[in-house]
């Protein structure tokens, strides 16, 4: 019986118990030997119903799965991996989480220091591997009684305190020396080293560091009584669902124009802004606003972003985290606050709308888009009518590239419907895994929509979807390549070979390989009939929508061109 292998478990016990106290309920575990102390302690927490463990064979997909869970729960999610390139595979998801302030905690097992840099197998330099993306990089010493258990608990908890206040990623690198197996449970739990923590260990809610959270109540701007009488525009980017409540009514009372991103979960009073803002007359008149207030960030629309770039008046930014959000270098007033807290201390003054043209053009776009999209099942019509494929109490996850732009431009969703995206770095990697994490953690019917290249990029994450035991429907929009690049002014031959990457793949055999249902509808009636069956199953379904390669991008460009040329009185 090895005392060292048991002590490795005791060391891991302190680390994981510290995480529990700050909201970690899920451990996402990749297979590996060096991480055994962490894995077995996580399983012990699952056995006592204090946490739930999940596994996947690909660390990159596992990390995005964890990100999806963090999005759905708004809690920190821990990832356990072994040493070597397993750690490096987490990087894309950690970048995304860092840019969107979602809480991930990486526990990377490592070789002990004496085995680094000397040619030992599966040993790389792991400390600092994620550069400055984590808010805390903790490189622990090799598990040893030379360090007090209280020091270890305090070190982990302090990182968690920081994460509670600012979101983002924590990296904890934990070297373990062999042996790693054949432990004694009694020895793990009753080592004298743990004695100072006994009262802490038996109370899962007791914290070693009782840090008070920063209570910085937002105050009313000293000149709000002046600004609320002026002409204003409110722009809402990505927001948590609960923060969007009340923004529409607040804007309507003020008589201000409200432009909402599809990620805002706010009912759009002026939908299709990405289309109607292409009209230069309306764009210029909207620039006559005295003040713009922006809630949230990660705005998708190119036209809305252009408006923000062109606006030179008073600019206020409201965001709950102390991060720098100023892509257009505005002279700005920053409010570190949740949106609904800001509204509470800035009462509106009832006024008539100061600009009517956006409403008129938005209403025109509603009928015009319907006419242009038509009744066939295609990329644009699915984006325009996406609400018709959603469950009443479900989630929508939208991938990147062309389709997310089409949804933002052409769709109007009900107030408060949960919409998830990966728009921090806006990559196409890990999208299916992220959707699977959202579906798993929320327990609600979930629809995800990705392009064919995105699906190919994350193909093995369909394995994660196959484990979901409630309706989870993955739409693959197959336009035989990267259709978003049709928007680029690149010579056709070069575009085809190095941008679009056209193919003739289809996804029926992929679904068969992972043992999930597959449907390929050709009409809206066919889709709705088959979706009814899919929602009746407690499992995942792939819906492949095969479309002509340039139809979506051509319609998008045509709508923008026609509305840009419309004459406004």
UniProtKB/Swiss-Prot annotation:
From the UniProt record, give the pathway where this protein acts. Quinol/quinone metabolism; 1,4-dihydroxy-2-naphthoate biosynthesis; 1,4-dihydroxy-2-naphthoate from chorismate: step 2/7; Quinol/quinone metabolism; menaquinone biosynthesis
The species this protein belongs to is Haemophilus ducreyi (strain 35000HP / ATCC 700724)
Its protein name is: 2-succinyl-5-enolpyruvyl-6-hydroxy-3-cyclohexene-1-carboxylate synthase
- Obligatory cofactor(s): Mg(2+); Mn(2+); thiamine diphosphate
UniProt-listed Pfam families: TPP_enzyme_C, TPP_enzyme_M_2, TPP_enzyme_N
Enzyme Commission number, as recorded = 2.2.1.9
Function field: Catalyzes the thiamine diphosphate-dependent decarboxylation of 2-oxoglutarate and the subsequent addition of the resulting succinic semialdehyde-thiamine pyrophosphate anion to isochorismate to yield 2-succinyl-5-enolpyruvyl-6-hydroxy-3-cyclohexene-1-carboxylate (SEPHCHC).
Q: Name any Gene Ontology BP term.
A: menaquinone biosynthetic process
Q: Which gene encodes it?
A: menD
